Amino acid sequence: MLFVIGLVFGSFLNVCISRIPRDLSIVTPRSRCPHCHAPIAWRDNIPILSWLLLQGKCRHCQRTISLRYPWVELLVAVFFVTSYAYFGLGWTTLKACLFCFLVVGLILMDAETGYLPAEFTYPGILLGMLFAALAPGNASGLLFVLAALERPVPAGPRWLSFIDAVSAALLGAAFFYFAWAAYYLIRKRHGVGFGDFAMMAMIGAFLGLRLTLLVIFLAPILGTLYALLTLLRSDRRQVAQAQPSGDGAVLLAEVPFGVFLGVSSLIALFLGRPIWNWYLGFFR
């Protein structure tokens, strides 16, 4: 049942991915073929099944429909089922499903358009903080900070979890602000978009301090590896531009960093605990 619900949400996410970056309504008009713009009948809009029955083509113009549509539906469904398997029945699973929905959407919109819409990130920040109170998570990061500062611990797990979420959102946004400022001072150009600030704040609100630190660590590593592999495997003229400097030409590649924030946050959501335990094992 949860898999089917995930397919439906994945289908809706496809609408968001296609329309929000173009500033179009996600309610009207009804779904249309991206090529001939013919309205898609309900029988041709069943997640995955319709795409398979039509062999990935529009019923009207017979042009190919992107494989992205069934893949997004399947991916969201898999994340929903994985969330239930990992967290069990409860608010935490609902929180994880919502987080996966938002993050998958942001990853694909950033990859396709370089746009991280406020329609996803701003409500995501508020929802992350709300769920922190409804489904208190592991606030060990905040407890460590409070102990180091010799400050009292807030009464009750809900308050502790909420403050942990707010602190993580502020930490995520602050990290990118200082990274943006440092890059601008050195290079005199913007290296991080403001959408990344909001996305990182949203991730912090959902994951809390401990896992947000893991995302801050993982995302630059993944981004750097991607940039290096792209430069090594592709024609430099297609992925970079030369910029003069004191040492000669510097090769700069455009990297959609929201993609790596999203991937890192999903890794942290499902594998963050064993990764932290592995890391802390070196100090025992």
Where are these regions (language model features)?
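Transmembrane helix-loop-helix
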Residues: 85-95
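Membrane-proximal soluble regions of multi-pass membrane proteins
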Residues: 13-69, 248-249, 257
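Membrane-helix cytosolic exit motif
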Residues: 21, 230, 234, 271-280, ...
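Functional transmembrane core segments of multi-pass inner-membrane proteins
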Residues: 2, 98-228, 278-284
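Transmembrane alpha-helical segments of multi-pass membrane transport proteins and ion-pumping complexes
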Residues: 7, 11, 15, 81, ...
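Hydrophobic, membrane-inserted alpha-helices
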Residues: 56, 75-81, 102-104, 197-204, ...
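Membrane-interfacial, low-structure loops and terminal tails that flank and connect transmembrane helices
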Residues: 32-35, 57, 143-158, 238-249
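Interfacial loop-to-transmembrane junctions
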Residues: 194-195, 232-267
